[in-house]
Amino acid sequence: MASRMGMVAILSLFVCALVASTSVNANVWQTDEDAFYSTNKLGVNGNMEMAQQQGGFIGHRPRLASFNRASKQLDREKRPVPSGPDPIHHSIPSHAPQHPPSYGKAPYEDDKSIASPGLSNLIGPPPFLDRY
């Protein structure tokens, strides 16, 4: 049974490797010119010089994370952050006030609203009864 499972695992890895080597996305592993240029005529936008300046790779490039955005600020101060909801993503009418409404007291600040007094007596260990 173990040898059969091992053979299935090896066969499945072989099939996955075969599919990956023949797929279009496997061009990363190839180093010949055919992997970088499908034709030797023109680049993506019809500009061969642009394709050569970019290192010759035509196709999907992964986006790299940029961590230097904050260091490029000239004034070295905090960036201004708008307050309130974004009117583009939230349907707020233009005549609505731009500040949040103020409430007198939140309902959870009252002790009676946390748990009703009838249930507070039931919480805890059961009372000791004389059974003997």
Swiss-Prot record:
Disordered: annotated span = 68-132
Q: Can you quote a single GO CC term? A: apoplast
InterPro entries the record matches: CLV3/ESR
Signal peptide start-end? 1-26
Q: Extract one GO BP annotation from the record.
A: cell-cell signaling involved in cell fate commitment
Q: Which residues carry this modification: Hydroxyproline?
A: P82, P85
Q: Name one GO molecular function term.
A: receptor serine/threonine kinase binding
Q: Is Glycoprotein one of the keywords?
A: yes
Q: Which UniProt keywords apply?
A: Developmental protein, Differentiation, Glycoprotein, Hydroxylation, Secreted, Signal
Transmembrane regions listed in the UniProt entry: none
Q: Is-annotated flag, keyword Secreted? A: yes
Q: At which residues is glycosylation annotated?
A: P85
| UniProt record similarity statement | Belongs to the CLV3/ESR signal peptide family.
For this entry, the protein name equals CLAVATA3/ESR (CLE)-related protein 2-B
Q: What is the lineage of its organism?
A: Eukaryota, Viridiplantae, Streptophyta, Embryophyta, Tracheophyta
